[in-house]
Amino acid sequence: MDPERAGPDTSSEPLPGAGSAAPSSYVGEDRAAGRYAVARRHRWLLGPAVLLLAVVVLRAFFVTPFGIPSESMQETLLVGDRLLVSRTTPPDQVQRGDIVVFDASEAFNLDVPQRGVLQRLVEAVESLAGKGQPTDYVKRVIGLPGDHVRCCAVDGRLEINGVAVTEPYLAAGARPSSTPFDVIVPPDRFWMMGDNRGASADSRAHLGEPGGGMVPGSDIIGKVWVRYWPLDRLGSVDQGQIASVPRNGE
């Protein structure tokens, strides 16, 4: 028999396992490594997401930052001061003399321009850093619902429900108001004034308009709680409570 034809030629056949897929243990390790990498990326994303959510919740329900943009509350609050405003004080617990931040768009009949989605998003991000909306004002509560407030009494002081009151937060020698007024605050409304009476566009500036410059309780964002900037003025803000006066008509 021809030795060259004795059997099939196997010299070109691959060895067992040659060219086959990698062992299953290697595949499992690769998959595990991939899952670990994905989980790690998710953790990196989850942390900032949770932090952002916490900030949003705190700002919406507890405290919100606010920067002082004007001189209307000098000398109590200066331009550039940064505050934390407590949102936990309901309107019926607001007292005379409290410093509050409120949305003045309704009370002061402000023209609010239409804003697109992108602009609203930018404003939302800026608000987290303490930049308020153009319609957010900070003033001192002078008249509560039902109060009779007028300026000025015979001795030149502000008068609430027939009682001339001392305002320790005004600068020395400052007049309570160069604009005379005599108002009765409606239910669920507040009469607001800035401490820098000569440079404050407050309730007095809107006497002849619909609503008479009275701020609805529902528009009060919160009560000023603490100043966190600048550091040399860090601390609580003196609310300068007005002395107790009787209710109107008592």
Show where each model-derived region lies.
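Hydrophobic membrane-insertion alpha-helices, especially the h-region
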Residues: 43-61
